């Protein structure tokens, strides 16, 4: 017997770019950017088992192999040209053009091979080529020493849609004083790239990207931002921003029945069926940042709310929604009497738990199947069979949240060390110092009586993120 099992997993991207900057005159500068990139995700899990039996004068060979292949290859060719014209002391006009040619090759394949038979199933095989064209113009206008205005217009075209998308943008900044300002921005944006990932996945190794299908409208969003900034004499930045974002025609992947627990069945989600999804988000962001001196760092707090709407679920909070998030990052240069060039750092992250759909019970489902009779076997009697399966009962989508998230990391860095003529920094980092258990997901099982085989209540255990690590 010979067995072979393995994974072939080339994954990564590379980009080649060329930039040409041309000073046409003291007031006009042109910049052209040409880029070619390839993103590649090619996962192949394979198993091959060869057996040989020798019995007296006969030899029997048996061969069984299977392959599971996921492939996502994206090739992008981009050309951008931008011209900046300093018209006068108060107006700076920018205009440009962009062209993106993208080839998508997305597939999923199952291959089963025996000694004399090969079975191939390809539930996903999508190849398409898209082209995005855009032209834009923008004017930065210094209305006065205190008021600055920026207005622009972008026109976008997607080759699979027979229309031109109009994207206006406006912004204004009012300098209350030399170190204090108020700003506002509004803009409309379209997107022609989508992901074919299960929206309920909390962890994924890769995003499967694809171009917007011809029969789907482009995703559109309107962003509005209001902000206030103050830069203190002690080189500390204080910033407050509030925002509102409205989304239409987001595409959410339709899910298979992920809560079924039928033995011997594979629950799958199609890669090319989507719900037309609406959404909106609003929030408040606070930032205090110090970038100079022996003690540096920043403190950021975010209050955010996000809601999605799909036909089967109504309005709900998506998996990535976190209402409260606090981040504290500090760096301290220790005095020379402790040690030369020694720096300590710490990072604290705390947030509300992410939403999830809770399982509230379990039920049995029965299905009826009729075999035989005149339609299938003329003259044979009909047979009626019943099949039972188990299914979890769930509450409303994302109606509960995981426990709050907390993590403290600390580290020490020794800078400007020397090895022969080379300089380097050495560091040690401790992750999750308090070993706080942060749930990534929950694992469920049905309690079973081993003596009778009867199935009882549903049990739950957390699948945690990073533990204490050095």
Residue ranges of each PLM-predicted region?
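Outer membrane beta-barrel strand-and-loop segments of large Gram-negative receptors
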Residues: 76-82, 123-128, 134, 217, ...
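Structural signature of Gram-negative outer-membrane beta-barrels, strongest in the C-terminal barrel
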Residues: 74-76, 86-92, 98, 124-247, ...
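Gram-negative outer-membrane beta-barrel transporters
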Residues: 144, 244-246, 264-355
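Short loop/turn motifs that connect adjacent beta-strands in outer-membrane beta-barrel proteins
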Residues: 25-29, 86-90, 143-146, 179, ...
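Transmembrane beta-barrel strands of outer-membrane/channel proteins
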Residues: 32-38, 95-101, 151-155, 184-188, ...
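Surface-exposed extracellular loop regions of Gram-negative outer-membrane beta-barrel proteins
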Residues: 2, 40, 108-111, 159, ...
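C-terminal beta-signal and adjacent terminal beta-strands/loops
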Residues: 347-381, 385-388, 402-407, 414-470
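Face-selective signature of the C-terminal outer-membrane beta-barrel domain
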Residues: 10-161, 236-239, 298
